[in-house]
Amino acid sequence: MQELYKELLKDVKGVTLHEQPADPRYDSNFWLCAATLDPAVRIKGQENAYKEVIKTAVGGAAGVIKAVDSATTDCQPNENVEALRVFMLGKKVECRPVWKPMHKQPVYKDAPAYVNGVSESIFKVGFCLPAGPYVSDDDVRYIVECIKEAIV
């Protein structure tokens, strides 16, 4: 699946598929197919990216919700990554940002953290592509076509 994503995305400017280092000590099974989206890439609907999310509640652990008046936080994906997620959802494809850095998770807000900015940088531009045993080659082709369609 990773190789098919790699082949189909190779000419899509601004989308970079995560690859393992050329070092033989690494041997990824690519259970997660992740990519980054260049901040300069524009996505259809990007100007409304954070207007599309639910603004009345932000999910928490075990279904706990907290009323909010803003759909944004101090650490969130770039607008184009969120716009791509929303666009893909409209195409019945679920993709998501990469995981929010642990030190930015509410449960760890008061915990000590040793950071250098890398995790926040990756979170702003990273997204996960559908992957798994039930994602077919035809599914991957459809997913990539949707990504191409989303880019303005």
Predicted regions and their residues:
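PLP-dependent aminotransferase class I/II
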Residues: 1-152
